[in-house]
Amino acid sequence: MQEINGTSHLKMGIAITTYSNEKTSATRIQIIRDSLTSLKMFRNNVEVIIVVDGSYNTDHKKLLDEFNGDFEIIYREKNGGISKAKNTCIKLLLAKNIDIGFLADDDVLYCENWHNAYATSILNTKIDHFVYLPPQIYQSVLRKTTYNNIPVIECTSGGIAGCFMTFTPKIIQQIGYFRIYPYVYGCEHRDFSYRCLKNRLVPNIFDIDNSSNYLKLHHLSLDSSSIIVDKGGLALNIEKKKEYLNKFQEYVECIE
């Protein structure tokens, strides 16, 4: 991607949330290893912070120790949930006076020039909040369009991914941090993006053009073997999720 305005003057930082417990599978730990290894390889001058959300098993801790000399690793005292963990990420990045921040989950794979691709798109489009839309989830509903004459990608179904997103200090100043309510895993990032839309900080929820050349969601991440669940309580968990999502939808409607 051409650097029309150049990005070398920008200070960039990424913060990654991670978590495990005694039920976390070996597959999931390998996913985290692959993610951090790729980031180490293509880090460049980006500040990197790993935020461990209050819980980790033995294998996870061994893995984190291996990267202790490469990344700044912060251990939250207790598991507070994804919103609080993401807020810790934002606070730590802002304290480093970054111009552009990246928030990511621990199952993203990084390719060469990933940071520059997003930073260049931010400069050229004037859109501070991009979200990565993994093709294996959104391929059938992705559409190429342009904004400020720059190619971008939008999701025609209105889907909003949360595994990787960008922000700037201006975004946080105007809409604040992640809200703790609603307590629904997977909805906190939607609320953040909806607020960017509501406050007209972004024209739509976009990803950069050709983002899969720069980021990838780990191919095992959506495999059921990557996360061990209580099969006996699975049906109940699904019903609870539906109930929570209905409440979340009401919440979204009331703020828009």
UniProtKB/Swiss-Prot annotation:
It comes from Acanthamoeba polyphaga mimivirus. The lineage of its organism: Viruses, Varidnaviria, Bamfordvirae, Nucleocytoviricota, Megaviricetes. The keyword Kinase does not apply. GO terms for molecular function: glycosyltransferase activity. Its EC number is 2.4.-.-. The keyword Nucleotide-binding does not apply. Belongs to the glycosyltransferase 2 family. Pfam families: Glycos_transf_2. This is Uncharacterized glycosyltransferase R363. Keywords: Glycosyltransferase, Transferase.
